[in-house]
Curated annotation (Swiss-Prot):
Disulfide bonds join 97-189. Keywords: Cell membrane, Disulfide bond, G-protein coupled receptor, Glycoprotein, Membrane, Olfaction, Receptor, Sensory transduction, Transducer, Transmembrane, Transmembrane helix. Residues 1-24, 79-100, 159-196, 260-272 are extracellular. Belongs to the G-protein coupled receptor 1 family. GO terms for biological process: detection of chemical stimulus involved in sensory perception of smell. Gene3D superfamilies: Rhodopsin 7-helix transmembrane proteins. The gene is OR2A5. Odorant receptor. InterPro entries: GPCR_Rhodpsn (IPR000276), GPCR_Rhodpsn_7TM (IPR017452), Olfact_rcpt (IPR000725). The chain crosses the membrane at residues 25-48, 57-78, 101-120, 140-158, 197-219, 237-259, 273-292. SUPFAM superfamilies: Family A G protein-coupled receptor-like (SSF81321). It comes from Homo sapiens. This is Olfactory receptor 2A5.
Length: 311
């Protein structure tokens, strides 16, 4: 970088301000959780692929959610694990940082929309069972999934384009363990008003709007479940819907606290903890929630294991 050129070409990720020993312990713990995330979501994908009884719209959307969780964790966690326990400067170049921000936003937006599609699928299955097979055809499910990915990626691209128009001339220390968009914007040498407005508008469109749709869907689903005469049918419907509601609560709850709730005295540390939920804990917990609370997934696992033993 020459004397007359002050543009930042790389950033320093400050990560967690902890002692080296604690960072090494966290590195081991987070590595273990990351492996569980890959194995759990990989197992969900494998079961859906191998068991024909899971070839339904609900598990089609669940497979997309598993792909998002694997991608989400793989975008943020490896860099964090590399930096944990290092005494030297933890740098990341501008282009990889921008790419990490794009992928982070794309996966987050897409997961919001996929969760809405899953709630719509449950609404049709429980409230309109006679029309379910006609409306939720494979072609329709594919269009809904592709639309979710396209909208999520397009919104993320808008955020990145608005970041690229900003000058970064120092400081160059990101108080985070990855290139989270709010932390990156704090380093800009120009007014970020437009970026903040777009982030707020996107939060309303991609967070508040979908959450309202999910809540409306489940209010009608709950009313329909309570009208079911069969105790077994009621338990099965509650089991499937409660798994999805747990996932919705984890994802939207942490997102609302992070982007829309009043900031604490230590907003940077709050963002780091909440980002851990996004990047590591939520992706790890989603397959556990579905495997422990969903009878169909547990049944599929038993059938797959039985086939392997019979060979």
């Amino acid at each position: 970088m020459t004397k007359n050129q002050t543009w930042v070409t790389e950033f320093i990720l400050l990560g967690f301000p902890l002692s080296l020993r604690i960072q090494m312990l966290l590195s081991g713990l987070f590595s273990l959780l990351y492996v569980f995330t890959l194995l759990g979501n990989g197992a969900i994908l494998g079961l859906i692929w191998l068991d024909s009884r899971l070839h339904t719209p609900m598990y089609f959307f669940l497979s997309h959610l598993a792909i998002i969780d694997i991608s989400y964790a793989s975008n943020n966690v490896p860099k964090m694990l590399t930096n944990l326990g290092l005494n030297k400067r933890k740098t990341i170049s501008f282009v990889p940082c921008t790419m990490q921000t794009f992928l982070y936003m794309a996966f987050a937006h897409t997961e919001c929309l996929i969760l809405v599609m899953m709630s719509y699928d449950r609404y049709m299955a429980i409230c309109h069972p006679l029309q379910y097979s006609v409306i939720m055809r494979w072609g329709v499910c594919t269009v809904l999934a592709v639309t979710s990915w396209a909208c999520g990626s397009l919104l993320a691209l808008v955020h990145v384009v608005l970041i690229l128009r900003l000058p970064f001339c120092g400081p160059h220390e990101i108080n985070h363990f990855f290139c989270e968009i709010l932390s990156v914007l704090k380093l800009a040498c120009a007014d970020t008003w437009l970026n903040q407005v777009v982030i707020f508008a996107a939060s309303v469109f991609i967070l508040v709007g979908p959450l309202c749709l999910v809540l409306v869907s489940y209010s009608r689903i709950l009313a329909a479940i309570l009208r079911i005469q069969s105790g077994e049918g009621r338990r099965k419907a509650f089991s499937t819907c409660s798994s999805h509601l747990c996932m919705v609560g984890l994802f939207f709850g942490s997102a609302i606290v992070m982007y829309m709730a009043p900031k604490s005295r230590h907003p940077e540390e709050q963002q780091k903890v909440l980002s851990l939920f996004y990047s590591l804990f939520n992706p790890m917990l989603n397959p556990l929630i579905y495997s422990l609370r969903n009878a169909e997934v547990k049944g599929a696992l038993k059938r797959v294991l039985w086939k392997q033993r019979s060979k």
